[in-house]
C-alpha cells in the first residue's frame, strides 16, 4: 500500500491503525515517511474500532479507507480528487481489480452503474444482503466529514460494508475505471476458515443499516418540505 501511495501525483497523508500490535514492527520505509502517522491501540480492539479511532486524527479534507496489503492505482487520488473539486459532490469512487499472486489482474465491475448518483441511490443496487455489494468501499474517496458520519461501525468483520453509508449522505460519482487493486493471497481475512461463520450476519446488519439510514434521511427531507 505505501509503495502505491508514493506513486500518487497529489499530496497525501496516511494514518495507520495499529490494532494492539507492537508499533516497532512498522516497516522502516513507513516509519521514516513524514506523511505517515500511526494510531496505536493499547489492546486489540478489532479492525472497525481501530480504524474509527484512527479517523479521529485525519487532517485532510477528503479520506479513503484502505487495507495495508492492497494497492491504489497510480492515478487513483488525482483522478477522483479532480472530480470532487470540479463537481462539488460528496464522494467519488471507481472500480477495483483483483491482484493475483502471479501479478495478473481481473477487473471487478460493481453492480452500481457508472455516473452520478444522488444520495441514497447506490443502496438500491444492493437488493438482498447476500448479493454483491453495490460499490467497493475502498474505492471511495469522500469528504472526511461524511466519512466520520458513516464510519466503519463496530462489526468484527465486514466493517467496510458499513462504510458504504457515505453514499446515503451526499451525491457522488462512480467512475468506470479501476482505482484500487485488491491483493489476493492465502493470509487475507476472507480466506480464513472462520470467515463464513459471521459473514451472513455482518452483511445483513450493514444492509439493514444502509436501508434504514436512507429511509430516515428521506423521511426527514419530506418533513422539512412539508
Q: Whereabouts are the PLM-identified features?
A:
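Conserved donor NDP-sugar-binding/catalytic core segment of glycosyltransferases
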Residues: 77-108
Amino acid at each position: 500500500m505505501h509503495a502505491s501511495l508514493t506513486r500518487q501525483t497529489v499530496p497525501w497523508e496516511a494514518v495507520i491503525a495499529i490494532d494492539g500490535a507492537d508499533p516497532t514492527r512498522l516497516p522502516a520505509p513507513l516509519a521514516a515517511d513524514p506523511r505517515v502517522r500511526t494510531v496505536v491501540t493499547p489492546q486489540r480492539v478489532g479492525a472497525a474500532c481501530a480504524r474509527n479511532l484512527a479517523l479521529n486524527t485525519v487532517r485532510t479534507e477528503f479520506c479513503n479507507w484502505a487495507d495495508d496489503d492492497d494497492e491504489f492505482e497510480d492515478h487513483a487520488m488525482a483522478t477522483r480528487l479532480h472530480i470532487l473539486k470540479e463537481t462539488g459532490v460528496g464522494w467519488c469512487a471507481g472500480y477495483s481489480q483483483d491482484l493475483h499472486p502471479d501479478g495478473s489482474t481481473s477487473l471487478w465491475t460493481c453492480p452500481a452503474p457508472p455516473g452520478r448518483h444522488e444520495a441514497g441511490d447506490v443502496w438500491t443496487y444492493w437488493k438482498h444482503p447476500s448479493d454483491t455489494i453495490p460499490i467497493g468501499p475502498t474505492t471511495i474517496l469522500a469528504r472526511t466529514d461524511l466519512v466520520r458520519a458513516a464510519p466503519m461501525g463496530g462489526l468484527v468483520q465486514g466493517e467496510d460494508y458499513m462504510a458504504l453509508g457515505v453514499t446515503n449522505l451526499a451525491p457522488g460519482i462512480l467512475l468506470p475505471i479501476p482505482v484500487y487493486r485488491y491483493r489476493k493471497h492465502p493470509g487475507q481475512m476472507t480466506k480464513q476458515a472462520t470467515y463464513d461463520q459471521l459473514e451472513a450476519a455482518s452483511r445483513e446488519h450493514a444492509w439493514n443499516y444502509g436501508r434504514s439510514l436512507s429511509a430516515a434521511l428521506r423521511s426527514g427531507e419530506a418533513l422539512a418540505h412539508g
